Amino acid sequence: IKMQLSKNLALAEVTRSETAKRKGISNMPTPEHLENFKKLAENVFQPIREHFGVPIHISSGYRSAALNKAIGGAGKTVNGVYIPSSQHCTGEAIDIDMDGTSITNRQIFDFIKDNLTWDQLIFEFGTEENPDWVHVSYESTGKQRKQILKAVKKGGATSYVPYK
């Protein structure tokens, strides 16, 4: 399906997944999730794209429940039914990774933090100066938590601590 979510963001960019392709997993959003992605594109992605004036690389966008489970994304199994808790599964989150470009992940993180409306912003691993990637979400109902976290490894497991 050829569709633009915003001027510079195509649906294909947020649904692309090597894991889904390899495992034959469908990764098409529902109409509701598509509407959520349009809000994220308008309020977060497009302002980033226009500010920096270069293509913005999305390393992870939409994830169907099956894809989220396959990659070990946030979720749990209740009575044998997998329930994803990641905002990637509702069309409300993207991960941005600008490695190999003239823009750093830190520049993206700081621009979002200081200039945009967002729900959750995560400085994903990396060094004190630069995250490995940036996770950002936009709550489709408009109720933004403005939660800033840092992902860290503790004893081999990922945990999220308040960003300072």
Regions found by a protein language model. Name each.
Residues 1-49, 152-164:
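Extracytoplasmic cell-surface/polysaccharide-interacting catalytic and binding patches
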Residues 42-76:
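Extended, low-complexity, intrinsically disordered C-terminal regulatory tails
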Residues 63-90, 110:
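Active-site-adjacent substructure of cysteine-protease-like catalytic cores
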Residues 84-85, 90, 98-164:
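Catalytic cores and adjacent binding grooves of peptidoglycan-active enzymes
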